Each structure stands twice: as C-alpha cells, then as structure tokens.
Amino acid sequence: MYVPDVAEDLCLDIFHKQKQVISRYFANFHCDVVRQLTERLLCHQGAVFFSGIGKSGCIARKLVATMQSFGEKAFFLSGDLLHGDLGVVSSGDIVCLFSNSGETREILEWIPHLKNRQVFLVGITSSPCSSLAVFSDFVVMLPKLEELDPFNLIPTTSTTCQLLFSDLLAMTVLRCRKISLSDYGKNHPSGQIGLKANGKVRDYLSPRTEVPFCSPSITVSEALTVLSSYGYGCVCVVNEQFELLGIFTDGDLRRGLSECGGAILECPLEQVMTRKPKVISEDSDVLLGLEMMESGNPVTVLPVVDAQHQRFIVGLLHMHTLARAGLL
C-alpha cells in the first residue's frame, strides 16, 4: 500500500545518506593517481581499453564514449574477451578494469591472458587487498563506501564513485590535450551539442538588410524612429561604407534621459553613442558570441563584422535568435 508520508521520509533519508557518502568520497579520494594515470595516457601511443562486468561495465562504456568524443583511442572490452575479442589487444596496450570488489570472477579470468599480451594493467577498485589490486601494474584506489540499499549490495554509491573518477580522468586528459571547441565539434556534428560546438555566427545572424543603421550626424530624436521600427533595441551607427562607428541602444537612451533630460534628444548620435561596442566576426564560433553577450556588462545583441577587415558590419547577432535555436 502506497503511503505518501512514508515515501517522503524514505526519500529524504536516502538523499541525506547520498550527501554524506559523496562527501566522504571527496574527503578520501587521492586525485594524484589521476595525474599519474593521465601522464601515462598522454605518453601512450597505442590503444587504451576499459572494461568491467555488470554496472561497472556500464561506467566503463560511458568513459570510453566520453574519451572517444574528443579523439582518444579508447575502446571497450566486452565480456566475451576470452571468446575471440582478446584479438584486439596488443602488446603495450593499456587495459583499465573496473571492479568494486576486485574479485569479479570474469575479470580475474582475463588477467593471465592479458598479462601474456604484455599489457599495462590498471585496476580500478575499492578493495586494496583484492586480487585485481595485487595483479595490476597500477591501482586506482576508490574510497570504500556503503551502498544506499538496506543490504549494502546494490551498486549505487560504488558506481557513483566510479563515475566521478571517470569524469575526472576524461576531463583531465581533455584539458591536457588542449582540445578546442572546434576539435570537439568535428567528432560531434549532430544533436544539440553539435549545434553548439560547430555553429558559426554567420549561421545565426540577422543579415545586413535587416539591421537598423543610422548616420552619426542625425539627432537622437531622429534615431528613435529607426530604433522603434526594429526589434533589436539598438541602432548601428555607420559611415557611407558601412564601417561600424558605434552603437546606440535603448539603454543609452534611458541613461541619457536620466542624466540630461529631454536635451539629449537634440544631440547628434556621434556624441552619445558607444564608440567601441562589443563586436564579433561572422566566422567566430556562435558560443563565443553567447559568452561575449553574457560577460562583463551583459548585452542582448552584438554587431557582426566581416571576417576579413573586422570593421564592416554584415549583420546582428541577437540573444533571442540563439534562444529560439536552443543554444541557451
């Protein structure tokens, strides 16, 4: 029978237990082993294999997928290793095996055959005296923490620890490799990640034909007609060659009215415009544009300039456009 109050109490109890055990993980895990393992991976020329049985295997698969996404030669060894899959392993390869207990039967059966291949064996376990720890060339010792279930048997906390280690290792390798957004995007052309990683400003800008332009000599009063005719909240101040001289926004107008009153309406734009606004090149990554909008003094629109000269305006990049594209 479902009792809401009981379910709520149990949920809160498990939630607090999660917080406690995760805190103990961070207090007891020595991340220097990640540094050492990263250094070996960076110097390694061959393949790197990860594997595990059951839930540990799921964590190994996830780590492989993450590392492959930024170009690492990482592969998953299936449970059929001794039924032919051993053929992909070569001398000198690195093989990393996940086992919380360090006594997983299938894993222990693999070890002699992997040793015969002269691999560098990495054991990732929570049991320092386990067979996996003893026979490994390098050991990643994860904190031994109790599981969340009443029997202390169901892989919950242990797999969370494995996942935290995996993400730390993958991101350390990524940072050391100095993987750029462009590098990552080449391996991830599809989905929302692909849109963010590969999108260029030119793909999202409003073209020059839709940009509100004004001459620097017209008054603020005259510019208001242009400003109110478009939905950008700004006008771009340009010369006859469409070189960007500055920008005037509705925020500039409010500040001017507050400081100068109605007299600002008769001022020429060149006296009140922002002369060095944030701009972005049309061939820049769209995520750079989003970062520029949100950093410093936040803005919702960026003038886009040509890639060659970096001064002729070719369009506008608007926050609303990026939101509609699902990039926020």
From Swiss-Prot:
GO terms for biological process: carbohydrate derivative metabolic process; carbohydrate metabolic process. It comes from the Bacteria. Keywords: ATP-binding, CBS domain, Nucleotide-binding, Repeat. One of its GO terms (molecular function) is isomerase activity. Residues 37-179 form the SIS domain. ATP binds at residues 52-57. Residues 205-264, 273-328 form the CBS domain. It holds the Pfam family SIS. InterPro entries: CBS_dom, CBS_dom_sf, KdsD/KpsF-type, SIS_dom, SIS_dom_sf, SIS_Kpsf. NCBIfam families: kpsF. Belongs to the SIS family. GutQ/KpsF subfamily. This is Uncharacterized protein TC_0679. It comes from Chlamydia muridarum (strain MoPn / Nigg).
